[in-house]
């Protein structure tokens, strides 16, 4: 499972990637409010820029926790400046909500693609699957999505129905994303399937390995790209498989 944790600097209102467990809520109380009380968050500045890992987010306190128990829902909320990700958690006393921008830089308007594409998502992290699903539904409102946490089921799914793009995590138990990509590319009848990796392992040397395995594109976690960039990259993969 790809894993990223973030620590927060309450003074600068920016997060930094960290490898140690910390109670991020203790450092970001000014960004948390109780839904029952309806108290709005007190933003320290109008030009805040939280580099939140919305694609692999989880609250941590002490030891790393089970994401599926810590997060119950994630949804997009309207914002005048940028789209945001609303994450509800139920483990830190009541129903709290953390609001974070879902992209960095200026928000670029995009036109959703209404084609009825079929997407296959595989990631051993349930929350990653849910958030990627919501991103894709934002970009492709008429798409059909099949998602699984079990990488060993992918080949059976590909043989049972037609998919336009498979989104693969790289580090998974069972079969890795690289192993899956090689298996897919070995079958001529699956050559029309686009393969996109979504992973924290996205150095240039990693991408060379992915390309050699037959992966068409790589998105790095955290997925800090504009919607316009994401849909442009996916469209490029789709066009190449026509």
UniProtKB/Swiss-Prot annotation:
Keywords: Phosphoprotein
Signal sequence interval, chain numbering: none
Domain (Response regulatory) ranges: 118-236
PROSITE patterns for this protein: RESPONSE_REGULATORY (PS50110)
GO biological process: filamentous growth of a population of unicellular organisms in response to biotic stimulus; phosphorelay signal transduction system; positive regulation of filamentous growth of a population of unicellular organisms in response to biotic stimulus
Annotated positions of the 4-aspartylphosphate modification: 169
Gene3D superfamilies xrefs: 3.40.50.2300
The keyword Ribonucleoprotein is annotated on this UniProt entry: no
Superkingdom in the source lineage: Eukaryota
PANTHER family: RESPONSE REGULATORY DOMAIN-CONTAINING PROTEIN, STRESS RESPONSE REGULATOR PROTEIN 1
Function of the protein: Required for stress adaptation, morphogenesis and virulence.
Record protein name field: Stress response regulator protein 1
Taxonomic lineage of the native organism: Eukaryota, Fungi, Dikarya, Ascomycota, Saccharomycotina
């Amino acid at each position: 499972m790809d894993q990223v944790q973030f620590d927060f600097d309450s003074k600068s209102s920016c997060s930094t990637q960290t490898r140690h467990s910390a109670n991020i809520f203790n450092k970001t109380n000014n960004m948390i409010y109780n839904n029952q009380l309806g108290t709005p968050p007190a933003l320290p500045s109008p030009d805040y820029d939280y580099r939140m890992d919305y694609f692999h987010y989880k609250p941590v306190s002490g030891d790393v926790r089970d994401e599926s128990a810590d997060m119950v829902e994630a949804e997009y909320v309207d914002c005048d400046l940028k789209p945001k990700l609303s994450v509800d958690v139920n483990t830190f006393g009541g129903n709290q909500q953390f609001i974070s921008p879902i992209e960095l830089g200026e928000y670029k308007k995009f036109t959703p693609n209404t084609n009825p594409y079929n997407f296959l998502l595989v990631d051993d992290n349930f929350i990653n699957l849910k958030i990627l699903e919501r991103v894709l539904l934002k970009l492709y409102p008429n798409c059909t999505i099949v998602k699984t946490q079990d990488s060993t089921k992918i080949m059976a799914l590909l043989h049972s129905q037609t998919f336009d793009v498979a989104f693969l995590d790289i580090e998974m138990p069972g079969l890795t994303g690289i192993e899956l990509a090689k298996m897919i590319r070995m079958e001529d009848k699956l050559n029309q399937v686009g393969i996109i990796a979504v992973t924290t392992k996205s150095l240039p040397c990693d991408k060379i390995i992915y390309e050699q395995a037959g992966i068409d594109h790589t998105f790095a976690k955290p997925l800090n790209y504009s919607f316009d960039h994401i849909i442009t990259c996916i469209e490029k993969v789709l066009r190449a498989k026509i």
